[in-house]
Swiss-Prot record:
Remarks, miscellaneous: Has the ability to complement a mutant in yeast lacking magnesium transport capability.
Official protein name in the record: Magnesium transporter MRS2-11, chloroplastic
Assigned GO CC terms: chloroplast; chloroplast envelope; chloroplast membrane; plastid
PANTHER family: MAGNESIUM TRANSPORTER MRS2 HOMOLOG, MITOCHONDRIAL, RNA SPLICING PROTEIN MRS2, MITOCHONDRIAL
Motif (Required for magnesium transport activity): 417-419
Main location (coarse class): plastid
Length: 459
């Protein structure tokens, strides 16, 4: 319920001036105990009457009495009052012109608030920008920068799909993956991260070895005819095959570099045990472990893809007016020719994946065999070192037994060396008898201890 302010209550607070040079009335705010009064021209009130709600005025008057107020606060308060007054005027039976002015003011305030909220959101969250290499189906290569929103809009992907190829998540997304979506295929093959679409492919981290190898493999294949003279495959399949070729060739090249070194070490190590050779064996073993893990991860990815016919069929229907039936994943196309071509491509894709799976398994198996040979050589070296360590321990024990026997003889000699009269020094033969007894006793004690240790199989 809107109430008109009582003159006795609000005369000291609000005073309308009739002598203003402006066509619209001016509103003066007079506060007790504050700075001199100031006036604020309100042009929006030229045709709209002011209605104050009693609760709002009372609460606002309390706030005025408690704290000092600035001109900005009055402006904000008046805007809120103006919006509420316009709402009240629209609910009551006011004129059409008054309602139109209130709606315009409220729309302006709402638009300004929405724009400010969007600006604050954009300032709070920084949208990532990717620098990619774009390879088109025609063979044109260009480097461009694209933000996340544009990338999602152009490829038809979702934000969670980008995480598999995001270069900033390289450490967390190191497992190879091939994700098939409606309009794009996402490739994550170690250092190669790309998005293959119908007419182009976007390559992230193109300066890395995997990106350069992928571009070098893809460019010769972008021609009207394939290498065997038959019709070329769709561009996205060419991109997938080029990615697999570049990745497997890199694994095979690493295997060819490591294999001769390991074979040479296996021939030398049984006879030569030096620190340099052992260190080279350790480094070669570490490289074999890394190569085997990468080949095994790629092999597992290809196996999972071959065991899921739904993903293969999704690759085949990209860019065609075809859908997959939910019950049995059967192809449903508007044109019979599209269905026939999709079924033929499905067989080609399966054969293609099986071919690269065999190459990957061969590389993985050879790396595992070399790694097993290196581990066996390490076991042989450990046994050899253990036998030598045992020989050294036996020799040390033999020296300790001899030292014990000699120490017993030295004890007897020390006893006779004391300045006590034993009457043996008066006889000339006593020296020779004592010396002979010490030597013979030490030898007998040594052989007795040696025979005891031999019976206990310590020697």
């Amino acid at each position: 319920m809107a109430l008109t302010p009582i003159p006795s209550t609000f005369t000291s607070l609000f005073n309308f001036s009739d002598h203003s040079p402006y066509p619209s009335p001016s509103l003066h705010y007079l506060l007790p105990g504050s700075s001199p009064s100031f006036s604020l021209q309100l042009s929006a009130l030229s045709r709209t009457p002011i209605y104050f709600e009693a609760l709002k005025v009372l609460s606002r008057s309390k706030c005025f009495a408690k704290s000092p107020t600035t001109a900005e606060d009055f402006v904000g308060d008046y805007e809120s009052l103006n919006v509420s007054d316009d709402d009240d005027g629209s609910d009551s039976n006011s004129s059409d012109g008054d309602n139109g002015g209130g709606r315009d003011d409220s729309k302006k305030i709402d638009s300004s608030s929405s724009s400010s909220s969007s600006d604050s959101t954009s300032l709070g969250i920084r949208e990532p920008v990717y620098e990619v290499v774009e390879v088109k189906a025609t063979g044109a290569i260009s480097t461009r920068k694209i933000n996340r929103r544009q990338l999602l809009k152009s490829s038809g992907l979702r934000p969670r799909d980008i995480r598999s190829v995001d270069p900033s998540l390289f450490m967390t997304n190191s497992v190879p993956s091939l994700l098939v979506r409606e309009h794009a295929i996402l490739l994550n093959l170690g250092s190669l991260r790309a998005i293959a679409m119908r007419d182009r492919v976007l390559i992230f981290d193109y300066n890395r070895r995997g990106g350069r190898a992928f571009v070098d493999t893809l460019m010769p294949r972008l021609n009207p005819r394939s290498m065997n003279g038959g019709p070329s495959m769709p561009f996205e399949l060419e991109a997938v095959e080029s990615a697999l070729i570049s990745r497997i060739q890199r694994l095979e090249q690493r295997l060819m570099d490591i294999e001769p070194r390991v074979q040479a070490l296996l021939e030398v190590l049984p006879n030569r045990l030096t620190a340099d050779i052992l260190e080279e064996l350790r480094i070669s073993k570490q490289r074999l472990v890394e190569l085997g893990s990468r080949a095994g991860a790629l092999r597992q990815m290809l196996l999972d893809l071959l065991e899921d016919p739904h993903e293969i069929r999704r690759i085949c229907i990209m860019g065609r007016n075809c859908t997959l039936r939910r019950g049995d994943d059967d192809l449903e196309c508007t044109l019979p020719s599209d269905k026939l071509i999709a079924e033929e491509e499905e067989e080609e894709i399966e054969m293609l994946l099986e071919n690269y799976l065999q190459r990957c398994e061969s590389c993985h198996g050879q790396a595992e065999r070399l790694l097993d040979s290196a581990k066996e050589m390490e076991d042989s070296i450990a046994v050899n070192l253990s036998s030598r360590r045992l020989e050294v321990s036996r020799f040390e024990l033999l020296l300790q037994v001899g030292t014990f026997c000699v120490a017993v003889g030295a004890l007897i000699a020390g006893i006779f060396g004391m300045n006590l009269r034993s009457y043996l020094e008066e006889q000339a033969s006593a020296f020779w008898l004592t010396t002979g007894g010490i030597i013979i006793g030490a030898a007998v004690a040594f052989f007795l201890m040696y025979s005891y240790l031999s019976r206990r199989k310590i020697f």
